[in-house]
């Protein structure tokens, strides 16, 4: 999976937080503090679409939405990183060793549900 640059991550955060698909102009308004040109927002959205992070509808103006939820994206990243580990068991052990008691309890519950 392709990585996200800082501006791409900011745009994705806005898309994930939106209640539905949004236009480039709406995204630009939400990023007004950044002083971005509309063409810049379009460029970022095009790159995100090429990387597989967003999809758009055919309406005019185009409205964009994330291809996956934030949680689905995080799960995809975890699977990708685990797939790159030379020793999956060791990687999982190190991961589990770093979780707190509540997260460990949640992991046990999820594993028990299968």
Model features per residue range: what roles?
Residues 42-46:
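Short, hydrophobic-biased segments on the C-terminal half of alpha helices
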Residues 1-14, 18, 69:
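Short alpha-helical segments that sit at the start of domains
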Residues 17-18, 33, 98, 113:
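Short helix-capping/turn signature of helix-turn-helix
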Residues 76-114:
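Amphipathic alpha-helical dimerization/coiled-coil segments
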Residues 4-7, 59-78:
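Short, cationic-aromatic polyanion-contact patches
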Residues 49-59:
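A short, conserved structural fragment
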Residues 21-30:
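Short acidic, hydrophobic short linear motifs in intrinsically disordered regions
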């Amino acid at each position: 999976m392709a990585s996200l640059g800082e501006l791409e991550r900011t745009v994705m955060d806005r898309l994930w937080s939106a209640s539905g698909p949004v236009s480039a102009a709406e995204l630009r308004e939400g990023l007004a503090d950044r002083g971005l040109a509309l063409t810049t927002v379009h460029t970022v959205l095009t790159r995100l679409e090429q990387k597989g992070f967003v999809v758009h509808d055919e309406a005019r103006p185009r409205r964009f939405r994330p291809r996956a939820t934030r949680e689905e994206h995080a799960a995809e990243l975890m699977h990708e990183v685990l797939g790159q580990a030379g020793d999956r068991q060791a990687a999982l052990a190190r991961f589990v060793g770093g979780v707190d008691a509540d997260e460990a309890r949640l992991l046990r519950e999820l594993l028990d549900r299968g």
